[in-house]
């Protein structure tokens, strides 16, 4: 079973610049291959699949050198996300893929775990090309790390969602005492420890009586 755990991160100035570049580059790659797949089908009746686009990505990075400044796996994931969007469209699970706009105030990219490129520490997380980023952990799961999705929300805050598989469920011991509940007539609820909750009807009468005094 796969499960994602979302944590807030606090990148420094240089890291924020790199994240902005990565958001922009992954959007560029997504839009580039969306246009290429659309044109190939409309002009020549050819359907370009993920493999064809992934191979072409190598040439695209040579043409646009600035693509090499960001995480290469994130660029591949952008191509994969586009392919997934097409698959969902053909299965009638979603609309035809749309171009990603620069004007959106929500950005994200996904990268995969490989050779220790992503690692979670006590107060930092290591991300490809970004380095060690300060993190506020919600919990430390036990499982096999698959990848990470880095995002920036409209408020300007940054988050990372770490995806794991084979996650161990943590069972917390009960720290409260068992309490029996009995419904009464005059008293609304009577707990086994003797505590009583007054019936709302009698409570209202009591309040009116106090107000008349």
Each model region followed by its residue ranges:
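Nucleic-acid substrate recognition interfaces
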Residues: 1-213
